[in-house]
Curated annotation (Swiss-Prot):
Key word Nuclease present: no
BP-aspect Gene Ontology terms: lipoprotein localization to outer membrane; protein localization to outer membrane
Stated role: Part of the ABC transporter complex LolCDE involved in the translocation of mature outer membrane-directed lipoproteins, from the inner membrane to the periplasmic chaperone, LolA. Responsible for the formation of the LolA-lipoprotein complex in an ATP-dependent manner.
EC number: 7.6.2.-
Main subcellular location: membrane
UniProt protein name: Lipoprotein-releasing system ATP-binding protein LolD
Binding, ATP: 40-47
SUPFAM superfamilies given in the database record: P-loop containing nucleoside triphosphate hydrolases
Locations listed in the record: Cell inner membrane
Subunit structure: The complex is composed of two ATP-binding proteins (LolD) and two transmembrane proteins (LolC and LolE).
């Protein structure tokens, strides 16, 4: 299988005088077609590792490689370009724009990449249909249930056909039934499109549905 994301000897420390390291010599590979889960207690560094993997945060030391390109250490321009071109994101709190319709929210990543309005609308509409949200396209975010909002967030995260999807506690604010449904949508999309996926979650039951479970504790990463 093709390696999409590779993290090599990555550490992340904060502070100078009272230095605290939340990640220590992390090594991780995510392959195309693989959906992996990252588990750990609150404060274990899951979000920090995901931010580094998504090129939003720079490691103190180590290397991050995305699709064969070294993205850390690298310039801000390189990280931004690679992130926009190859990555899709889903967060616990959806960050959807309240003043936009569902369709306009999902179109936004396409527009950021420079696609015209008609192309962006066509692609976004197709993704919403895949999510079973075609009837909600013209709705405002405030009109949706929590589960529907999170499915819109998933749609927005995958609309640009990213090489890898990174999700940080995407079901943390949902009830168990809706959590399972949203998690299933992510999993199925990764498999159907032969993408790579890494999801941070505190839900071990959901984590067991993935191809591989990784545990972060004391700044160290182990595979379960």
């Amino acid at each position: 299988m093709t390696t999409v994301l590779e993290i090599l000897d990555v550490s992340k420390c904060y502070g100078r005088r009272n230095r605290v390291c939340v990640l220590s010599n992390i090594n991780l590979k995510i392959q195309r077609g693989e959906f992996a889960a990252l588990i750990g207690s609150s404060g274990s560094g899951k979000s920090t590792l995901l931010h580094i993997a998504s090129l939003l945060e720079v490691p103190t030391s180590g290397t991050v490689v995305l699709n064969g390109t070294v993205c850390a250490p690298a310039s801000d321009k390189t990280r931004t370009m690679m992130r926009r071109k190859h990555m899709g994101f889903v967060y616990q709190f959806h960050h959807l724009l309240q003043e936009f319709s569902v369709l306009e929210n999902v179109m936004l990543p396409q527009r950021i990449l420079g696609h015209g309005a008609s192309t962006a609308e066509s692609v976004a509409a197709a993704i919403l249909e895949e999510m079973g949200l075609q009837d909600k396209a013209e709705c405002r975010i405030s009109e949706l249930s929590g589960g529907e909002r999170q499915r819109v967030a998933v749609a927005r995260g995958i609309v640009n056909s990213p090489t890898i999807i990174l999700a940080d506690e995407p079901t943390g604010s949902l009830d168990p039934q809706m959590s399972k449904a949203v998690f299933s949508v992510l999993h199925k999309h990764v498999k159907a499109k032969n993408l790579a996926g890494l999801v941070a979650t505190h839900d071990r039951t959901l984590a067991k549905q993935t191809d591989r479970v990784l545990s972060l504790s004391g700044g160290m990463l182990t595979e379960l």
